Swiss-Prot record:
Keyword line: Metalloenzyme inhibitor, Metalloprotease inhibitor, Protease inhibitor
Region: Disordered, residue numbers: 1-27
UniProt function note: Metalloproteinase inhibitor, active on a globulinase from L.albus seeds, thermolysin and gelatinase B.
Record's protein name: Metalloproteinase inhibitor 1
GO MF annotation: an example: peptidase inhibitor activity
Sequence ranges of Acidic residues compositional bias: 1-12
Organism superkingdom: Eukaryota
Keyword Metal-binding (UniProt): no
Length: 27
């Protein structure tokens, strides 16, 4: 398992959560 890949996955999850929060705020 590459640590770099883990970081990328964490970033993607963070972005998704952030987008979800923004969507909730818009609603």
């Amino acid at each position: 398992i590459e640590p770099e890949r883990q970081e990328e996955e964490e970033e993607e999850t963070r972005q998704r959560v952030r987008r979800g929060q923004v969507r909730q705020q818009q609603q």
